[in-house]
Amino acid sequence: MKGEFMANGPPDVDLIITGDRVIDPSSGLDGPAQIHVTNGKIVSLSDDLPLQSASRHIDATGMIVCPGLIDMHVHVYEWVTNFGLPADDAGVNSGATTIIDQGSAGPWTVGGLKAYVADPAITDVRCFVSANVAGALMGGMEGIVLHNPGMMRIDAIVNSALDYPGFVVGIKSHGEAGGISHWGTEVLEMAVKAAEESKLPLYVHTGELFPVDEQNRPVPASLMERVLPLLRPGDTVAHVYSNMPDGIMGPGDEVPAVVRDAYASGIHFDIGYGINFSYRIARSMMEADILPNTIGSDVHADFNCYHDDSKLDYSMCGAITRLCALGMPLADVISRATLNPARILGEE
């Protein structure tokens, strides 16, 4: 994992970074420290090496120094999907050293994502493979044709995890009004089964995405009662601060009991920032002690803004800034952007 901190390392270092605020969630450090780098890797933290013992010194006084940010939600299958960004624009150029593409590639197309996007990138790119075989080639309303039960192959999902270990690190599915109005929870149930067989976590989009069959529109207040009980501890739901009436919060002003229960059970909540963030909903959820476990930016091309009360920039650092503005301590936010996702990826 790029940006990794190791507890102790050899005394010979190539680079010393000195900072008056170094935040390392894995050790609990939040204060002045030296960072020692050898062969491009951080090997130790201390404050007692002479600066002349390294060939290079960076003075990071007045800056925040932390492990590389891990963005749990991006879309970077450029030229194959109609909403993919260049990987390094979503990654290192935006402050994230590791990014997780969420469902742009399916089991039949994931090889191209690795060969033509991940491998050439400076950024460490991983993916949650789409539950449908082709992936999310078309975003928004047009994409529904790809996400019906006939496009699901559990064996293909499992094989993609076996073929690309360490790159395919999870499965992406949907628990939203459009798909459920057409097929109920069948697609999500198949995704859960694939996740169980492949021993991978599931990441689930919430909030309306695909066209709704109005004759079968799910009741917004009870939609999450159909979705969340299907998930397992360690799975993740996205867009937890969305203002969509059929999102996590529902149409009311109180956090539903099923949401509280899911959070308490160990289901992870990801901010899924992008076009699905509302300060109003965020405040309500935070007042109920529902805080995001991870911070995904959901950066992708061609945004249409559906949020109700804020103009957003769609970046990992933008999401971090908003959470700090809502009162979360910076060290806590950094932990949710580094240590927590590293644990989900099994790379703590």
Where in this protein do the model-derived segments appear?
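Histidine-rich, glycine-flanked metal-binding segment
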Residues: 5-66
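Divalent metal-coordination and catalytic microenvironments
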Residues: 20, 35, 40, 62, ...
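Metal-associated gating/positioning segment near the N- to mid-region
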Residues: 52, 59-120
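Alpha-helix-loop-beta-strand connector modules within alpha/beta enzyme cores
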Residues: 66, 116-128, 194-199, 262
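Active-site mouth loops of central-metabolism enzymes
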Residues: 71-83, 141-152, 179, 214-216
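Metal-cofactor-binding active-site regions of metalloenzymes
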Residues: 94-100, 104-105, 120-149, 172-179
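Histidine/acidic residue-rich metal-binding segments in metalloenzymes
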Residues: 112, 152-269, 276-293
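His/Asp/Glu-enriched, well-ordered alpha-helical/loop segment
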Residues: 282-348
